[in-house]
UniProtKB/Swiss-Prot annotation:
Pathway: Cofactor biosynthesis; thiamine diphosphate biosynthesis; thiamine phosphate from 4-amino-2-methyl-5-diphosphomethylpyrimidine and 4-methyl-5-(2-phosphoethyl)-thiazole: step 1/1. PANTHER family: THIAMINE-PHOSPHATE PYROPHOSPHORYLASE, THIAMINE-PHOSPHATE SYNTHASE. The lineage of its organism: Bacteria, Pseudomonadati, Pseudomonadota, Gammaproteobacteria, Enterobacterales. HAMAP family: TMP_synthase. This is Thiamine-phosphate synthase. Mg(2+) binds at D70, D89. It comes from Salmonella arizonae (strain ATCC BAA-731 / CDC346-86 / RSK2980).
């Protein structure tokens, strides 16, 4: 059995929106979301520090699991709940500093080789994607689909996992049926005609996660 070498997270993190602004963080936490990620890309630390601080403050106010994507130094400095890193970030990040600071770590993966790399770091959770085609970001790999996702879940057994990539309200039940512990969503909420209704429906399907 694989054991994380970072502080643990619940096996089921529930609905896990990934958003690029503090405004979305505040709206979704107020709507009942309890696991969320701030993902701001391609800016210097100084440019995003105020947003990171505001997001972490909101996370504490709502007793939520607030992950910061990429900006691990700021996450440590301001004591976020956790950090999420991509495969390339793993090579340049001081993982021991994150661990010593008591922050949780999530790592993105796209195939078996990247899962091996993630497992070597023994993070708090492993993200598996992209499950379906996605317009949110350019992806060099092909979508994995539900069968491949289910195979990864079987391999990872009781390790906390998150599925990401093209997960819509309609697709969410089938994704969760693979046994994955959480679904990360972006456009299913941010591009919904009624984001409040979409969030409520997704929460009803995926839950808020375990305590």
């Amino acid at each position: 059995m694989y054991q994380p070498d970072f502080p643990p997270v619940p096996l089921r993190l529930g609905l896990y929106p990934v958003v690029d602004s503090v405004a979305w963080i505040e709206c979704l936490l107020a709507a009942g979301v309890r696991t969320i990620q701030l993902r701001i890309k391609d800016k210097r630390d100084a440019e995003v520090e105020a947003d990171v601080v505001a997001a972490i403050t909101l996370g504490r106010r709502y007793d939520a699991r607030l992950f910061v994507n990429d900006y691990w130094r700021l996450a440590i400095k301001h004591q976020a709940y956790g950090v999420h890193l991509g495969q390339e970030d793993l090579k340049t990040t001081d993982l021991n500093a994150i661990r010593t600071a008591g922050l949780r770590l999530g790592v993105s993966t796209h195939d078996d080789m990247e899962i091996d790399i993630a497992l070597a770091a023994r993070p708090s959770y492993i993200a598996l994607g992209h499950v379906f085609p996605t317009q949110t970001k350019q992806m060099p790999s092909a979508p994995q689909g539900l069968e491949q996702l289910a195979r990864h879940i079987e391999r990872l057994a009781d390790y906390p996992t998150v599925a990401i990539g093209g997960i819509s309200l309609k697709r969410a039940p089938a994704v969760l049926a693979t046994g994955v512990g959480s679904i990360a969503v972006v456009s299913a909420i941010t591009q919904a005609a009624d984001w409040r209704a979409a969030t409520a429906q997704l929460l009803a399907i995926a839950g808020v996660g375990d305590e």
